[in-house]
Each structure stands twice: as structure tokens, then as C-alpha cells.
From Swiss-Prot:
Keyword Membrane assigned: no
Post-translational modification: Contains at least one intrachain disulfide bond essential for its enzymatic activity.
Annotated active site: 102 (nucleophile), 106 (proton donor)
Name this protein carries in UniProt: Xyloglucan endotransglucosylase protein 8
Temperature characteristics of this protein: Optimum temperature is between 30-40 degrees Celsius.
Tissue expression remark: Highly expressed in mature fruits. Very low expression in leaves, flowers, calyces and stems.
InterPro entries: Beta-glucanase/XTH (IPR044791), ConA-like_dom_sf (IPR013320), GH16 (IPR000757), GH16_AS (IPR008263), XET_C (IPR010713), XTH (IPR016455)
Gene3D superfamilies registered for this protein in UniProt: 2.60.120.200
Disulfide bonds: 224-233, 268-282
GH16 domain location: 26-215
Major enzyme class: transferase
Family from the record: Belongs to the glycosyl hydrolase 16 family. XTH group 2 subfamily.
Keywords assigned by UniProt, alphabetized: Apoplast, Cell wall, Cell wall biogenesis/degradation, Disulfide bond, Fruit ripening, Glycoprotein, Glycosidase, Glycosyltransferase, Hydrolase, Secreted, Signal, Transferase
Organism: Diospyros kaki
């Protein structure tokens, strides 16, 4: 039986309300749920700040109430100061189900005075193994910095303080699945001392616990909320130019600078890991 005009209108109102909610000023009470960790995850300052903590018993995490299908998402993070070795702070988009799409920022802790490793990965249709790692050009525990994901039908770009550090293009034309599932935003802190710092050689020093990461200024102004099997971007008048944005010449130059000066691992040049040849997308990504 065909849906009535009234039910269609109700769905449209729901989507418009979701879009307006996501475009308003950040409020963690409004936008997120604590996912795990109990009192280790705290929403403070009337919803303006979140802290996630890790102790020997457990880590903690939160997730967005909304699902997104394409978007530009920003969050400011201040990472664990001092001896953060063995800890991992995550900030990522992920779909539901076993054949997942995922866009990962992970911050691997280190000894006091040693740099964090920014670990990135992309899963498309359940396939990952696309790790790239970087050293940041600042201390991410000294102050808040902005980490952003641009995801549209043409490309995915990882940004740090508006500087692009990684791009994953739509390469369906050569048989590489692209990310097209609705995703939530997640963040967490947890213990990974079996691998996180120097391949697991440095273990977590629990005398330094609790380890705490802070979050503020979440923005999803340019993000398509997915609800009732429809996208809010079909209702928003204008403001969706980012849906077709790609890196311009200036941004591509900044990306090349990051790759030359800050990248410490790239799966696309790991011949030992891929003795039969690197994945097909690498042939395009090497020429940026």
C-alpha cells in the first residue's frame, strides 16, 4: 500500500529536525550517548566537554546518536599527557554489521617526551589493512587540536587542524569498494600495550592511571543525517557544496608536505607485507 502524503510529510519533518539539530552548536548531551566505561566517561560543563578515562579495570567510550551518510565532521581533542605508553585513543566513523565501512583516527601513546603516533585506516565493505601512520608536528597533549573527516561520494580526506594528512579516493572504477553505508561517530580510550607502543615493547604504567582524553567543539554542520532510510541533505537548501569537494592544488601541496615530512608508515609501499603486489588503490594514491 502506498504511503500517505501525511506519513511522507512526517518523515520529512523528522529528517529536517535531525538536520537542524546536527547543525546547531555542539552539545554532547544532545549529540552523543556514553557507550561504555560507566563513570570513566563524563559529559561536563552543560554538555560542552567530554572526558574519557582509562584505568586498569576498564577504558571508556561514547558514540553519536545520529547516523551519517556523507559529511564533514570536526572534533577537538586533547590527548593523554605525560607517559601515555600502551594507551590508544580512537576517533572514528563506523557502520553497523559485520561487513563494515570505517574511517579511523587512532592515537598511539608513548613515553613522556616521545611523540604520539597518528594511526589511520580505512575499511570498505569489510576490508581494511590500509594503515598509514604519521608523527604530528605539535604536542597533541598540550592543548586541543581539531581532527576532521571529509567524506563524500568522490573522496575521503583526513585533516589535522585543517591540514590534509591523508586522502582515500573513490576507486570503484578499478574494483575497489567505496564507503557507502551510514555510519556513527565513535570515540574511546583503551589499553593496547601488546602492540601500541614500539610494537608492544613498552607496557602501560598503571601507576600513572587514570589516563584521560578530553573532547570539545564537535561540529557536523556539513553532514547528512541518515534517518528513516533517507538523507537530510535532500531537504537542506544549499550549503551542500562539500558533497562534491576534492582537494585543490594548494591543499594537495600541503598533503605532499605531510607525506614527505611526517609519514612514518604507508601500506602502499610495504612490499614485505604484500609480496604479490600492493592493493590496487595504491597505484593511484602514490601519484598525488
Amino acid at each position: 500500500m502506498a504511503a500517505s502524503p501525511y506519513s511522507i510529510f512526517a518523515v520529512q519533518l523528522l529528517l529536517l529536525a535531525s538536520w537542524m539539530l546536527s547543525s546547531s552548536s555542539s552539545n554532547f548531551n544532545q549529540d552523543f550517548n556514553i557507550a561504555w566505561g560507566g563513570g570513566r566517561a563524563r559529559i561536563l560543563n552543560n554538555g560542552e566537554l567530554v572526558t574519557l578515562s582509562l584505568d586498569k579495570a576498564s577504558g571508556s567510550g561514547f558514540r553519536s546518536k545520529n547516523l551519517y551518510l556523507f559529511g564533514k565532521i570536526d572534533m577537538q581533542l586533547k590527548l593523554v599527557p605525560g607517559n601515555s605508553a600502551g594507551t590508544v585513543t580512537t576517533y572514528y566513523l563506523s557502520s553497523e554489521g559485520s561487513v563494515r565501512d570505517e574511517i579511523d583516527f587512532e592515537f598511539l601513546g608513548n613515553l613522556t617526551g616521545e611523540p604520539y603516533t597518528l594511526h589511520t585506516n580505512v575499511y570498505s565493505h569489510g576490508k581494511g589493512e590500509r594503515e598509514q601512520q604519521f608523527r604530528l608536528w605539535f604536542d597533541p597533549a598540550a592543548d586541543f587540536h581539531t581532527y576532521s573527516i571529509l567524506w563524500n561520494s568522490k573522496t575521503i580526506v583526513f585533516y589535522v587542524d585543517q591540514t590534509p594528512v591523508r586522502e582515500f579516493k573513490n576507486m570503484e572504477s578499478i574494483g575497489v569498494p567505496y564507503l557507502r553505508q551510514p555510519m556513527r561517530l565513535f570515540s574511546s580510550i583503551w589499553n593496547a600495550d601488546e602492540w601500541a607502543t614500539r610494537g608492544g615493547l613498552i607496557k602501560t604504567d598503571w601507576t600513572q592511571a587514570p589516563f584521560t582524553t578530553s573532547y570539545r567543539n564537535f561540529r557536523a554542520d556539513n553532514a547528512c543525517v541518515w534517518a528513516a532510510k533517507a538523507s537530510s541533505c535532500g531537504l537542506a537548501a544549499g550549503g551542500n557544496a562539500w558533497l562534491s569537494v576534492e582537494l585543490d592544488a594548494k591543499s594537495r601541496g600541503r598533503l605532499r608536505w605531510v607525506r614527505r615530512n611526517q609519514m612514518i608508515y604507508d601500506y602502499c609501499v610495504d612490499g614485505k607485507r604484500f609480496p604479490r603486489g600492493v592493493p590496487p588503490e595504491c597505484k593511484l594514491n602514490l601519484h598525488i
